[in-house]
């Protein structure tokens, strides 16, 4: 089995967890490859390991990716697996751990259970983003695990967000922005904006306006095979798109 190890934030504690995982894998004879940004934190042993680069598709021989950190790290790990379907095992070394599987105080036991194949796969929906005009920010990564959000940038005025579902006009939202959330993301920004909680296995997406002018504009749930086309207008020349 070949494991890719990923981390995004390097506190003393998280480095300790990474080293513990490395030692465990070495003791069990498993092959592994490390995210390149881990290298400078490993001291004298750093040159003895293999590394993979940021935003580059992982080797097809990788069986699993271990994301060591909190929920934010796990979300960022999507950028290195993209649509390769490599499973992610979350190891919590951060503050939040809603998406991670192995907790801090059960690290070794959790790894033992994993390599005994005492796990199950849970598939999560991703959102793919395409823009009419080329954007350098989306050159390497166009997928979102939690949500895609459109927000105001240089204005306090509302946005006019024209929304199409499968080429059929849905509505024009007058609001501060719009959240398109997956079931995974339904407990994040969308929830704090009045959206529903959706179970991870639900094959749907949530369309949720942020502070809409018309209070009758409530969140809408649509099938996850839906293609959304969104056109944004406002007093500002630019708007924010976040994944």
Where are these regions (language model features)?
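Short glycine/serine/threonine-rich phosphate/pyrophosphate-binding segments
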Residues: 14-15, 72-77, 187-192
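Catalytic core of DAGKc-family lipid kinases
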Residues: 95-176
